[in-house]
Amino acid sequence: RGLGETNIERMKRHLKEKERKIKKKLETYQKGRALVRKGRERRGLKTVSIVGYTNAGKTTLLNKLTGRKEYVANELFATLDTRVGELWLPNKRKSVLLADTIGFIKELPPELLNAFASTLSEAVESDLLIHVTDASDEHLLDHVDVVEDILKSLGIHETPRMLVMNKIDQISDAKKKAIINAFPKKNLVWISASEDLGLEGLIERIEEEIG
């Protein structure tokens, strides 16, 4: 029993240390963000932010749409800062800023949510949110609810947004039909960022929404 308690304490210390390192990274990223944002404002570009549950494919989508080569990993908090690229809108003949944000998780500790809020400043000030989901995940509906709840807690639930179903190359027609039935009032966008499916249609929707 004593050994078990020791292991539990060791695990708690490990998690505490990991949380401390994450907070420190977030503080570092936050310092220069205000100056960078002012520079973007001077250029007069609108901002579109990609939000979603962790591992939904947000960074892959940013890379494909902007030509950036950001780190992609199947792990929590792989994207701690907010990465930003430019997306060219051909029909509008102008660019918008496209920002990738951290992946949300269920029951995010309040102290970490406060720290992450600073990195989500791009999303808070965005003209449009792209809520990316993993259509192949069995917990899809729960993940959508988690993201919506966090957006509400950040006060940005009324920002215009679209719901994008990613990884459609991994789902059956029956699963697609079930998803459509689950979101009867949503004009869903269907893509596979990794396979370059539906990206042109997504850009057209962004053009429509951004005005």
Map each language-model feature to its residues.
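Conserved nucleotide-binding/hydrolysis micro-motifs of P-loop NTPases
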Residues: 102-105, 135-139, 167-172, 194-198
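Short coil/turn segments at beta-strand junctions that form active-site/ligand-binding loops
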Residues: 93-94, 127, 159, 186
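Inter-motif core of Ras-like GTPase G domains
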Residues: 112-137, 153
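Conserved G1/Walker A P-loop phosphate-binding module
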Residues: 1-113, 120-124
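Canonical P-loop GTPase G-domain recognition
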Residues: 159-162, 169-211
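Amphipathic helical hotspot of TIR/SEFIR-family domains
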Residues: 140-154
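Structural beta-sheet core signal
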Residues: 131, 163-165
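Conserved ATPase-coupling elements of RecA-like P-loop NTPase cores
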Residues: 107-110, 139-144, 172-177
